[in-house]
Amino acid sequence: ILSGLVGSEMCIRDSFHWDYPTGLLDRGGWLHRDSPAWFADYTAAVAQRLGDRIQDWMTLNEPQCFIGLGYGSGIHAPGQKLPVRQQLKMVRNVQLAHGMSVSTLRAVCARMPCIGWAPVGIVWYPHTSKPADIRAARTATMACEKNHLFNNTLWSDPVVLGRVAPEARRAYGKLLPKYSDGDLRIMAQPMDFYGVNIYQGTPVKGGKKGKAQPVPFAPGNPRTAFHWNVTPESLRWGPKFLHERYGLPVFITENGLSNTDWVAEDGRVHDPQRIDFTRRYLRELRKAVGEGVPVKGYFHWSLLDNFEWAEGYKQRFGLIHVDYQTFRRTPKDSYYWYRDVIRRRGQGI
């Protein structure tokens, strides 16, 4: 399978998508001071086996989720609810693990690696094209709030810019663990792209003193089966603001729609909502490209209906329908549409 994917230039390695060895979890997991070294050892083992064939690598996927939801709200495994101070210690260890993983890949891979990571993109986008709204959206996109970890700059400033974000210092204050100069040097290994998972955003307008004011969604605003608001603009402004901040090419590592899909009497799966969703989002991404954002690529989530960590098999994200009783796979209408989009290299969307 790997050789076939490599031959088709469709191979990118996601090194960590949340499954964590129980033995290491029992020793403290991401709270343990040696957890970055454990991850570097794992990276070395994988790179020794696959580094001659895989060129593109992501170190960690959605760290806001596996820490914030796994150890903050407890919605995801391992289902713990820890104080923010302890979660922030985990953040630092995750950032160290990322940096050590990047260094390991560059040292071990036989093929020159192209490396990034893939945090969640927290996007606030301007309600109108007014400069005040754009400024407010940019500021909100980079902001941090003290009660949770779902933001951009707490995570990415140390690994890209080699500093603790000013927004994080203001929000968390004394709750932040110490970041030594040596820590920041380890974290801020050169990356080749900034991966980001974007599904939705929040519209804002400029309020008093430039403060961002969220704009309520109109009644009946389109929502996914996951109850996420459909906001195509987020795929324009998110990459734009993140590129302004970090200066790296952007890779959309996840974007897609959870929909209510089933096999119709004609044996097909008709999902016009997914086609419309993807078309609208890709059009906005094209606007970002036209405005100078170097977009390296786009991954649709997902190829197959899949298992979601907290939702199980309730949410169907796939371009291919999976019958979970028989495991029969049925390409949806969106599968054929997206295939043609790829063949046309995005022309005509």
Set out the residue ranges of the language-model regions.
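Single conserved hydrophobic/aromatic residue that forms the stacking wall/gate
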Residues: 1-7, 12
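Active-site neighborhood of glycoside hydrolase catalytic domains
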Residues: 77-112
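Active-site groove signature of glycoside hydrolases
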Residues: 16-27, 47-81, 114-122, 296
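Surface-exposed, active-site-proximal loop segments in enzymatic domains
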Residues: 19-36, 68-85, 129-134, 261-270, ...
